[in-house]
Structure formats: structure tokens, C-alpha cells
């Protein structure tokens, strides 16, 4: 039976506390938590454009506060956020964290975020001492399965590879687990989860299309594409003189742009 949880209006990216009694989420540019039994939501930190979070067994929440940032950490009881990871050369984002058993080591996705796409993605692990090791090139959104496997997304498919959580190393070849899982090309986020008992739940589908074209639509319904390049366009508005189009592009950050119809330029 599904029921709404008060205090979670506008919530995205929900995640449970290790004991299942609290729900973490993002809303209104903030990281928050709320009891599953009800009560007021508690703000834990700022997160203007979040890219995932994980609640560790030692009372720490790892989270990505924005599309272009390393990971941060905050005590689940509240307090100041602190840096958790550092960006390596050639990347501008660490995101989609997953604490390993014990709550000290951490899996995450690293890469280069560009408009509407996460490129050069790879799965990395950081030890309790802060040492980083890159594990799987081309993978995203890792999760640890109690069977001793690292599960991750690659091309909207779920893959699994044997993983030693003590040595923080893969041990063997990856095999496909599920074909066709909903994945965002802009964030790498993939719609699946694994319970502590090993059950896997996912949303069937594939890579979501975020690219759209701007088009003129005549009164007879005929469409004529404009020369503007594809983007994640939203809410286009034509200027009073008919020469420009104001439009939002919702990619790494949602921003307003102007398309000049006479020059075919977007700025």
C-alpha cells in the first residue's frame, strides 16, 4: 500500500537510512531528511542541482550537491558539510555515491559533465583513508550487492562483476544482469536499487531521450524544424517582434537562452 509522506513536496532522489526509519531526499535546493512515520522534514545542507546520495551505517550521508562538483559529506544528525572526494584531472563531477558495508569506503561515478551528457564516465572507489582507485571505465551508478558483486549501469544495461569489499578490487569478468533499464544520459542515474537481502528492483526501459528540436508549427499542423541544435528545450516564448525565441535549456543546470531567428544563433 502506497502512502504519501508529509513534508516531502517536490522531493527527488529519495534514499533510506540504514535502519529504514528515515528517508533522505532533495527538495528546494536542499538536502533533507524526514521520519517515515511522519513529522517535520529536517534540512541538512545545500544541494542546488543534486546528483545522488547515500546514507552510511556510521551516521554520514554522502551526496553530490551540484552537477559540477566533488562529493560532500554531512552528519545525519546535522552539522556542517565537508568535502569527501576530490576531482581528478579530466573530470568535473563526482556523483551517484554508494557506501560499502561498514560505512567507510565509498563507490561513486566520476566523469566529465557536458550539456545533456555525462562523458568519460567511470566507476571509482574511495577507501576510508581517502585513497581513490578507478575500477570500471564506461560504467555508471554503482551499487554493492550482498552476493559480493558490484552492480553498475552500462548502456542502459545492468552489469555485475565480483567485488572484494575488503581489498576494494574487482575480481573477474563482468556479466550482464538485466537488459534495458531506464537511464538518464545527462546524469548517468539509472532506475534500480538493491536491498540488503539481495533483491533487485528496476524500471524497464532504456536511455531516456532529452534532446529536442525547436520547430515552427503552421495552422494546418505542418512542422518546420529550426536550425537550432538539439537540446533539452523547455517553455519556448516568441518575442513581440517575432525575431527571437526565449527558451529554457534543462541540462546540467536549467538556464534561459535566446535564439536569434535571423542569425540562427543561440546565446
How should these model regions be labeled?
Residues 1-267:
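Acidic, proline/glycine-rich low-complexity intrinsically disordered segments
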Amino acid at each position: 500500500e502506497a502512502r504519501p509522506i508529509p513534508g516531502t513536496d517536490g522531493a527527488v532522489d529519495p534514499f533510506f537510512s540504514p535502519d529504514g526509519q528515515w528517508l533522505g531526499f532533495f527538495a528546494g535546493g536542499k538536502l533533507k531528511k524526514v521520519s517515515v512515520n511522519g513529522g517535520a522534514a529536517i534540512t541538512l545542507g545545500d544541494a542546488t542541482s543534486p546528483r545522488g546520495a547515500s546514507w552510511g551505517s556510521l551516521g554520514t550521508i554522502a551526496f553530490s550537491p551540484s552537477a559540477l562538483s566533488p562529493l560532500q559529506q554531512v552528519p545525519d544528525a546535522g552539522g556542517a558539510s565537508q568535502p569527501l572526494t576530490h576531482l581528478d584531472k579530466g573530470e568535473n563531477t563526482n556523483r551517484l555515491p554508494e557506501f560499502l558495508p561498514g560505512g567507510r569506503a565509498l563507490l561513486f561515478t566520476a566523469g566529465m559533465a557536458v550539456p545533456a551528457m555525462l562523458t568519460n564516465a567511470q566507476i571509482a572507489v574511495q577507501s576510508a583513508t581517502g585513497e581513490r582507485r578507478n575500477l570500471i571505465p564506461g560504467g555508471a551508478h554503482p551499487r554493492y550487492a550482498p552476493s559480493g558483486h558490484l552492480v553498475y549501469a552500462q548502456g542502459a544495461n545492468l552489469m555485475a562483476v565480483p567485488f572484494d569489499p575488503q581489498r576494494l578490487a574487482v575480481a573477474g569478468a563482468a556479466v550482464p544482469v538485466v537488459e534495458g533499464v531506464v537511464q538518464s544520459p545527462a546524469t548517468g542515474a539509472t532506475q534500480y536499487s538493491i536491498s540488503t537481502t539481495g533483491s533487485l528492483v528496476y524500471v524497464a526501459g532504456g536511455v531516456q531521450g532529452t534532446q529536442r528540436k525547436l520547430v515552427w508549427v503552421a495552422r494546418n499542423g505542418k512542422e518546420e524544424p529550426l536550425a537550432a541544435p538539439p537540446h533539452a528545450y523547455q517553455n519556448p516564448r516568441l518575442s513581440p517582434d517575432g525575431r527571437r525565441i526565449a527558451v529554457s535549456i534543462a541540462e546540467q543546470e536549467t538556464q534561459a537562452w535566446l535564439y536569434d531567428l535571423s542569425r540562427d544563433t543561440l546565446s
